[in-house]
Amino acid sequence: LHGSMANALPHAIGAAFADRDRQVVALAGDGGLSMLLGELITLRDHELPVTVVVFNNATLGMVKLEMLVEGMPAHATDTPPVDYRRLAESLDIPALRVQDPRELRSTFADALGRRGPVLVDVVTDPNALSIPPSITAGQVRGFATSMTKQIFGGGSGEVMAMARSNLRNIPRP
């Protein structure tokens, strides 16, 4: 299950209560999970078979992208970093943390091999854009406008960091 801004974990809890013999995987951004951290206690108290995967980029990524495509520089979307592994462990929930993409496969195998709740904190690039399946001309114009505003507002370093993070992911012939 995947949910933006706080619905992945409640859906996963419902699915786990419906069938306790099935492993449920909840994919959540750090912003959405932080809105419902108390539900981790529900997982623990009921020993629900839910693996919570947190995409931890220390930003409200979708909110940021929505602002950028509307021509506004992102404002108040970055958050202080949180170590969700330590947070889960403080609740006696087994947890793992991935900071290197090469560790993903083995970490997920470890997580899925456990019974009961487990949290996987996947640290991701805060500048990596979540690209929608289709992009309109208006979104391109809005994004270009917001980047221009950022540059003229003294944020050229941020624009360059975003460009570097995203250009490396474009396939080359």
Regions found by a protein language model. Give the residues of each.
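Thiamine diphosphate
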Residues: L1-P173
